[in-house]
Amino acid sequence: MNGTEGPFFYVPMLNTTGIVRSPYDYPQYYLVNPAAYAALGAYMFLLILLGFPINFLTLYVTIEHKKLRTPLNYILLNLAVANLFMVFGGFTTTMYTSMHGYFVLGRLGCNLEGFFATLGGEIGLWSLVVLAIERWMVVCKPISNFRFGENHAIMGLAFTWIMACACAVPPLVGWSRYIPEGMQCSCGVDYYTRAEGFNNESFVVYMFICHFLIPMAVVFFCYGRLLCAVKEAAAAQQESETTQRAEREVTRMVVIMVVAFLICWLPYAGVAWWIFTHQGSEFGPVFMTIPAFFAKSSSIYNPLIYICMNKQFRHCMITTLCCGKNPFEEEEGASTTSKTEASSVSSSSVSPA
């Protein structure tokens, strides 16, 4: 083993010189330069500074504008709530602990931070899955005479929370555990050890299959079918430049959504799986910290992609920020009207919202 395992922690450094200490009690500056902890704290502050306004504004604008409170937008509000969980339950904690250079909040704080960060991340993950399924159902109509309504939206929300809890709760009750990871300033699921009595092996396999491979397969399938439907509609109206433009726009948005999903989850899942399958191999603290950056930054770019790219949400946000008047209203309105009239598969139907 190329690390030091202790009660409820694993430090990725052999204690050959006796300098390794518990990440709950002592600064971990022997792992990386103290400047790296300052950089981590600054990064967390940036995520809070950007993530809170974007996601809070999403909720506020929806409350203010009744036309946004439609079943198809429920999942976007769920995504904003998930991101706020990450901001308050994860980012603020990591910023505070990185300022001290170790997980100063102790074992209980590690459980709470790990739980809320995992819960928020998983709600966000399954919200993207439900979002893809909803768009596929609305556009491709795999079920004839199906009309998406409020009950379906509520079922989708309940599903995201059930799946998120199915991932975040088990480490609190003995199936795996939360321990400090990376630079030892944030907590996550124990991929690092085979600690007796925690069944880490089965939990990691369960997470990798049920909370990464299956969601990724569903997202790829739904957006793949959606793209096929849009291209078929565009092929049937080849003479319409507006339809072709709408098809290109939808393709661009789908590619962005899929790439963002992969950027968010593939590095973290890949590194976690490598650590799990190569236990005892040597790796540095930054090896797990950097992929976590990609997953955490989703609280910023997911709202930008799934909410701010939606014309209706964007219009209402600008109206709210500009005290009730949208200076771009005429331009956006003309564009939307033209596209809606000319295309049988409007890009707004398959846009992020």
Swiss-Prot record:
Residues 334-353 have a biased composition (Low complexity). A lipid is attached at C322, C323 (S-palmitoyl cysteine). Residues 62-73, 134-152, 225-252, 309-353 are cytoplasmic. The gene is rho. The modification N6-(retinylidene)lysine is found at K296. A motif ('Ionic lock' involved in activated form stabilization) lies at residues 134-136. Belongs to the G-protein coupled receptor 1 family. Opsin subfamily. Photoreceptor required for image-forming vision at low light intensity. While most salt water fish species use retinal as chromophore, most freshwater fish use 3-dehydroretinal, or a mixture of retinal and 3-dehydroretinal. Light-induced isomerization of 11-cis to all-trans retinal triggers a conformational change that activates signaling via G-proteins. Subsequent receptor phosphorylation mediates displacement of the bound G-protein alpha subunit by arrestin and terminates signaling. PROSITE patterns: G_PROTEIN_RECEP_F1_1, G_PROTEIN_RECEP_F1_2, OPSIN. The chain crosses the membrane at residues 37-61, 74-96, 111-133, 153-173, 203-224, 253-274, 287-308. This is Rhodopsin. Phosphorylated on some or all of the serine and threonine residues present in the C-terminal region.
